[in-house]
A protein has these predicted regions:
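Hydrophobic h-region of N-terminal signal peptides that target proteins for export
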Residues: 6-16
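Catalytic glycan-binding domains that act on GlcNAc-containing polysaccharides
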Residues: 17-126
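Positively charged n-region of N-terminal signal peptides that target proteins for export
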Residues: 1-3
Length: 126
């Protein structure tokens, strides 16, 4: 029964999504809303949502890393990554946890270093 509940929760999470304001806030925090091949983190991140090569690989989205310069593709990558590493936050639309995982990796929601980042995204979501 517990396994069934977990499967149902995962299925629900796959169909839920954070509000549009989350995507706008993430874009603004990462690159001030700019588009294109923006390099960040000393060349380690790319595109409007500042995705690293490791993040892209972890997302398991097909295509090439260079495609993250396109905002629509970058959103697909972030969506897949967050659904993989923060499915409950995704289903609940928990923008703070989602932002912290985006910023700090799979354990980002537990890292003190991501608290301010999460708060900044949350402020912009309002």
């Amino acid at each position: 029964m517990k396994r069934l509940a977990q499967l149902l929760a995962l299925a629900a999470a796959a169909h839920a999504a954070p509000p549009e304001s989350f995507w706008r806030a993430l874009h603004v925090v990462e690159t001030s809303g700019r588009h294109g091949p923006i390099l960040g983190d000393n060349g380690r991140s790319l595109g409007p949502l500042q995705i690293s090569r490791a993040y892209f690989t972890d997302s398991r989205v097909g295509g090439t890393y260079e495609q993250v310069v396109d905002l629509g593709f970058a959103r697909k990558v972030v969506s897949a990554y967050l659904q993989r590493y923060a499915p409950q936050a995704w289903a609940a639309g928990d923008v703070v946890t989602l932002a912290r995982v985006h910023n700090g990796g799979p354990a980002g929601a537990r890292k003190a270093a991501t608290v301010n980042y999460g708060a900044k995204v949350q402020r912009l979501c309002k």
